Amino acid sequence: MEPPAAKRSRGCPAGDEPGTGARRSRPEPLLDLSAKRVAESWAFEQVEERFSRVPEPVQKRIVFWSFPRSEREICMYSSLGYQPPEGEQDTRVPFTRGLHLLQSGAVDRVLQVGFHLSGNIREVGGPGEPEHLYHVSISFDRCKITSVSCGCDNRDLFYCAHVVALSLYRIRHARQVELRLPISETLSQMNRDQLQKFVQYLISAHHTEVLPTAQRLADEILLLGSEINLVHGAPDPTAGAGTEDANCWHLDEEQIQEQVKQLLSNGGHYGASQQLRSMFSKVREMLRARDSNGARMLILMTEQFLQDPRLALWRQQGAGMTDKCRQLWDELGALWVCVILSPHCKPDERSGWLQLLGTWDKLDVCPLEEGNYSLDIPSLQPALTSRTGSEDEEEVTAASPRRTVFSRALQAGELHWNDSHLQRILASDSCGPTLTGSMGSDKPTFDPQGHPIWLGEPFPTACARVDTLRAHGYPHKALRLACAIINTLRLQRRHQLESYKQQKKELLQKGATGVTSTEGWVGHPLDPIGCLCRALLEACRLEEEPHSLFPDSAPEKRKLAYQHVLVPGSPGESYLALALEVALLGLGQQRALPEGLYAQDKVVRNEEQLLALLEEVELDERLVQVLRKQAGLLLEGGPFSGFGEVIFRESVPMHTCARYLFTALLPHDPDLAFRLALRAMRLPVLETTFPAGESHPNPLDSIMSNRFPRWFILGHLETRQCELASTMLTAAKGDTKWLHAVLGSVQQNIHSPALLFKLAQDACKTATPASAPPDTVLLGIALELGLQVMRMTLNTMTWRRREMVRWLVSCATEIGPPALMSIMKNWYSLFTPVEAVTIVAVTGTTHATLLRLQLDTAGREELWACARTLALQCAMKDPQNCALPALTLCEKNHAAFEAAYQIVLDAAAGGLGHAHLFTVARYMEHRGLPLRAYKLATLALAQLSIAFNQDSHPAVNDVLWACSLSHSLGRHELSAIVPLIIRSIHCAPMLSDILRRWTLSAPGLGPLGARRATKPLGTDRAPLCQLLDAAVAAYITTSHSRLTHISPRHYGDFIEFLGKARETFLLAPDGHLQFAQFLENLKQTYKGKKKLMLLVRERFG
């Protein structure tokens, strides 16, 4: 690798001096050119050791050029790169505040003594506050700030605004800064008297601070054997760093650790995750600048991540960490891969990092790559290997080692950059085959067209190299390697297609295939497809405005614009087209769904991220051609493509990718777009695994057993499948051929009733725009989908069934009377009887529906006849719940009403309950049909049985209503119902209540009625005498029953009961004699209950 490129300063140090333009036009003096190079690379101590005497002008130029010259580096160490809330405009970023202080003239008394810069910063206070004065000092060496000190109390990750202001002043106004040699050089020019005067004045000026230290040092110097006298020379803080000192930018390690710890403790908040991601971005920024602090900062962050107390808790519970935390760990692992793979790090640095990673990897709390701690979950891999027939692979999988988030980085430690072919690829855009062919390797190094390929390692590892090169500031080398990898993929695809053509007939006959890659590229821990796409897209990005020092801090992110950039050595190729090609290649790869909830979530998230990248690219004619070509290859890719004719049962579905391709291709090639999307509608994991021709006893059980516990994201996948179908239906509006093709695919592949219902609603909404006539074909498809939902959910009631049924009726209404009558005629395969009679028939015949259908009289009568037929059929199938609604619907048609009434009568003989019969009887009375009400009431009484102790039976009110109805109809009806009452009711209070009601005037007969002279019925004549005898007998039976197990606390209730019994006994002509005989019988029978009998005598004598 070439050495790091020299940084260019944003502005000339002499930029504010007069005559700057004239100086810029002249060549730079050789002294300055030499001093610049020395100042960048050599410590000043090394210069002094190399040359016995360095002239003062040379020393001054070296010291002058040793201060950092790039504002971008100052910005890197004074801004985290987060996006501030809207309206703040970066006021919290130290770099912005420091720039404002500089521009407002707040920097004063700047002095550079050797490699030490100092100055004062005056900052205006808030309202009513005095001006603040801060003293800032900066040490630097070899164009890097090595330490900072400021009087403010701001504690942040990076430099404060005052340090920024002083640094920017030194960069922009370098020649206005007073420059002195290191203080040791000045002291060496003084004689004894001058030195004594210097020391005394220094002590006098700062006696309160330095006097104790000065006295201690004086005592040690005067002591001959002291340690200070044994050391040659004296320290000079202004003389720069020594030869052995580390040369790196100042980084407050303690503050970084504290900040990460605090952010992790607030891990549930969105802002904490954003700030940690910003810190990761800062690490990448440092790596790109080839700053050694990138690795230092990553080590500090990793240590704090591993000390997160939640890790131990999650491990103890055997649970997975939160999604936000998991994503942060993924980013941490990816950064370590970039650091370990660094192409310019020293071997001892890499060894130290690998040792650290090895230690962390062995920790119990170190997160595993799949996202969870050790949980016993069913493994997919044995199933995969059994299908592919590879026993060796199964054994390897079963014995797979524990993989943590650092495993990939540890594996990267085994890689190197000294492969000769790899070096040739990275070195030149015009790398071509030589006479030696394969460069002495067994693997080919060029494709048949002479383009370099890279087969040295697995595809994800090769892509990690691309990401590493890009992360470390080698964008051109990253692009060269990315192109070689794409050439390799193309060559492999050609070989795969040739292999598939030979096996195509066999695979199609078999109807199944094994998965070709158990470790997919999308959702892979190394994100290979994302690495390639970002590297290629970055080369095509248009910079419409000057590059900002901190691009992420803009209040609103602009949509990125891309342009075609030609690939050197490949005419007609562009990086933008390659990015699109490789993204589609990765998204369309057939791959097995990984294990674990997080791994599956990651597949979905990674797919969405890649598609978001592609959606930023505006498609032109060249890219559309790439889309067409790749879509065709995906359709013909066989087992290597997720769009192939035959796919593995548990491969990742292509719905999301297909939706993007469909939308992109539709304006240019509708036929290809529909063929691709229809092919992607499959979700084979929901299909039963039984051989063709054998039906499963319960298909739902088969589906559920296949769903769990592995397919954690199945709900999400089904939703994406529904969205793809909805997009196709909307696009196919007006095209009968494709509409029916989409309908067939939906009916075959979508198995969720809820999603089918949503799809039907969407289709109906699309088919009935407010400002245009409806699309009848699409409406018919919406209705067909609704009918399928009804059939699927007929025997599995859901809380949304009523909503679905109502919607189906409204959809059929939109189509017209034939559709509405069709669902009424075929109701038995779609609805329950209750749904059909209470929702379908009622909604279909409302006034609003009739107006909507705009039917004439004959059409209305036909619809009513259909509804009445439905009602009668429902009443016959479920009279218990449908009889009354059927009668209501048939009110206006005498024949239908009579038929419904007859169904009720027949059902009464077949066991229709008394409660339903009473309900229908009351309805008949309300309709003015008392005789029919009476008939139904007698049928209900015949089924009723009320025991002696059921005073509060639910049917009490119905019985009293039936008695009142019979009383109002006349003596004949009353005489007929009395035997039923006596046979069905054995409750004495209830019988006496009925008896008293019948002794009053008949209800409904006013004083002017035709029977106003009729006398009230007497209890001494039939039919009431029979009821009186039954009531008396019931009281006698109930009394004996209660006395059998009576307790003293119920004596009072029993006395009240006897009081009511006496009232009933007295209704008979000889009632007091019967009651007296009854009491005497009680006294003789229960003479052992002396207290109770005493109470009876006291009350009744």
From Swiss-Prot:
PANTHER family: ZINC FINGER SWIM DOMAIN CONTAINING PROTEIN 4, 5, 6 (PTHR22619), ZINC FINGER SWIM DOMAIN-CONTAINING PROTEIN 4 (PTHR22619:SF4). One of its GO terms (molecular function) is zinc ion binding. Residues 1-29 are annotated as: Disordered. The keyword Zinc applies. A zinc finger (SWIM-type) spans 134-171. This is Zinc finger SWIM domain-containing protein 4. The keyword Zinc applies. Keywords: Metal-binding, Zinc, Zinc-finger. It comes from the Eukaryota. InterPro entries: Znf_SWIM, ZSWIM4-8_C.
